[in-house]
Structures are given as structure tokens and as C-alpha cells.
């Protein structure tokens, strides 16, 4: 099925599948966002990344292979030479997971604890950039007025300074980078890690902040569930002196992600503006009710 949203990646899908000997004629779109995800018959998932992301795609495949060798359950690349460059975009091929659902807070905590305990691999993962693509997203956020965009730019600059001066925390390690229940899922046979593109070396608090923000900022996680997360991991990151800096970076990313996509998806404009209004103190104190953006 081809729509106006899926059409830009269709040529890449066809070219990449031809390169590795797969048939894309009955491919079905699974998720159309910054990266496009397609399903092929036979349990193959095709991931079409943005142009210019070939190095990241190669690293993601290598990370998956390293996790498999380390005993961590995660998505697995299929046995073809990849990534494939097609129509200027890197394309990777993965084994489809069995039926699964979002992980619980305990699932997330236990997978993160297992990951954080691993020794660093013998290849370069790169160091965490907590503000990756924030500037690009702000530039694309055309539904916001100039005053709001200027304020967000200033917030970005202030948080970048605070990040460099953040207090010491836990020892740095391999981190997932986007550790929320949609990426750390549960199948009938156990917990599985997905979406490996943001894995890097950095402070483990960055992974823990994702769940904490869902309690303190968006209100998606009740305090009782957050307490189970802390018990399972062994630490409450909200008590760390650097929490507000990392939480602020997470909030900024969530706002700019929504604002960027509102420019091409008008139905998200109200939510993007709502998030900006919350940060600017126009919607009362945290937690706020932020709806998901796909």
C-alpha cells in the first residue's frame, strides 16, 4: 500500500530489496516517521533511515551483533550484507519480533540494568549527544512563532552549558539512549531491546531519566509505578543533583520533535504548541498531559 507519506521511500525499498534478493511487492508500511519501517512476508522488517545516516546504520547492525554475543535479547539483523545504500538512504533488514507489547517499568529497569553492566565493546560507539538534532528540529518548526522559537533556542543554549557542568554521577557505560517502554518490550518469552540507533557511551542516568520524566513531566507514569522502576534498577535518578538538567534536555527533545513534525502534520500542531506553552509556564506546574507523537 502506497500513500503520499510512504511514497518518498518506496524507491529505496525496491532498490534495497533487489540488492539482497528480497521481494518488496507485498511490503506493508509499519511506521512512517523519521525512519520508515516496512514488513515483508517471511518475518523480515526493513528499516529505511534518513539520508546521511549510513554510519549510524552500520553501527546499529554492529551493536545488535554485539548484544547477541553479550547475551542481551534484542532485535537481530538478518544474514545479509548490510546496510544497503538505496536512493541515497541507508537500509537495514531485521528479523521480525513475535507478538509483543510495551514493557512495564520493571521490564525497562531490568533491561537497562543488564545493559549498563556490560563492558564497553571493542568498537567505537561514540559519546552521547543529548541535544542531537534539536537545532535542526527548531529550524523546521514553522508552526511556532518567532518568539517561541527564540525562547527554545535560548533554553537549548542554557541546557548545553548546564550539561557540560553537570555533577558527577554513576560510572559511564553503554547506554540505550531512548529507553522507554516502546523500545524495551515484552514478548511471550521475555524482554527484548529494540531501536538501537541511539546506543552510545554516556551517563547511565540518561537512560533512567526517560522513565522519571514520564512521571515528573508528562504524568504518564504514576508514582507507584515509578517506585517499582526504582526498586528494580536500584536507584531513583530524581534524587541526583543533575536530574533537572537531564530532564530539561529530555523535555526539550520531546518539544522539538513534536514541533518539527507539526510542520508537515497539522494535526500535531496543537500538541506541539501545548508542549511549548508548558515549558514557558503557561500551563501551570508539572506534570502536564502530553499526548504521544508518532
Predicted regions span which residues?
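Conserved Hanks-type protein kinase catalytic core
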Residues: 95
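Active-site acidic catalytic loop and adjacent metal/ATP-binding pocket
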Residues: 31-46, 77, 160-208
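An alpha-helical support segment within catalytic cores of ATP-dependent transferases
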Residues: 6-13, 120-177, 234, 286, ...
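Regulatory N- and C-terminal appendages and interdomain linkers associated
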Residues: 1-24, 150, 274-294
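Active-site activation/catalytic loop segments of kinase-like enzymes and analogous catalytic loops
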Residues: 205-238, 249-266
Amino acid at each position: 500500500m502506497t500513500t503520499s507519506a510512504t511514497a518518498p521511500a518506496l524507491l529505496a525499498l525496491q532498490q534495497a530489496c533487489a540488492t539482497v534478493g528480497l521481494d518488496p511487492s507485498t511490503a506493508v508500511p509499519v511506521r512512517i516517521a523519521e525512519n520508515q519501517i516496512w514488513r515483508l512476508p517471511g518475518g523480515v522488517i526493513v528499516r529505511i533511515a534518513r539520508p546521511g545516516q549510513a554510519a549510524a546504520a552500520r553501527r546499529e547492525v554492529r551493536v545488535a551483533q554485539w548484544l547477541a554475543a553479550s547475551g542481551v535479547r534484542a532485535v537481530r539483523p538478518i544474514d545479509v550484507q548490510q546496510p544497503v545504500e538505496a536512493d541515497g538512504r541507508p537500509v537495514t533488514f531485521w528479523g521480525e519480533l513475535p507478538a509483543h507489547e510495551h514493557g512495564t517499568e520493571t521490564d525497562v529497569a531490568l533491561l537497562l540494568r543488564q545493559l549498563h553492566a556490560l563492558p564497553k565493546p571493542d568498537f567505537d560507539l561514540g559519546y552521547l549527544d543529548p541535544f542531537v538534532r534539536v537545532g535542526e528540529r527548531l529550524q523546521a518548526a514553522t508552526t511556532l512563532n518567532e518568539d517561541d522559537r527564540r525562547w527554545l533556542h535560548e533554553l537549548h543554549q542554557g541546557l548545553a552549558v548546564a550539561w557540560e557542568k553537570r555533577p558527577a554521577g554513576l560510572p559511564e557505560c553503554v547506554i540505550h539512549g531512548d529507553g522507554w517502554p516502546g523500545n524495551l518490550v515484552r514478548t511471550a518469552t521475555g524482554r527484548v531491546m529494540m531501536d538501537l540507533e541511539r546506543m552510545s557511551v554516556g551517563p547511565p542516568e540518561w537512560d533512567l531519566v526517560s522513565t522519571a520524566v514520564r512521571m515528573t513531566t508528562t504524568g504518564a507514569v504514576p508514582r507507584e509505578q515509578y517506585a517499582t522502576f526504582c526498586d528494580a534498577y536500584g536507584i531513583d535518578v530524581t534524587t541526583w543533583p543533575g536530574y533537572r538538567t537531564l530532564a530539561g534536555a529530555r523535555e526539550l527533545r520531546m518539544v522539538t520533535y513534536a514541533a518539527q513534525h507539526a510542520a508537515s502534520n497539522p494535526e500535531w500542531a496543537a500538541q506541539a504548541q501545548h508542549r511549548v506553552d508548558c515549558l514557558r509556564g503557561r500551563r501551570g506546574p508539572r506534570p502536564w498531559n502530553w499526548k504521544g507523537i508518532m
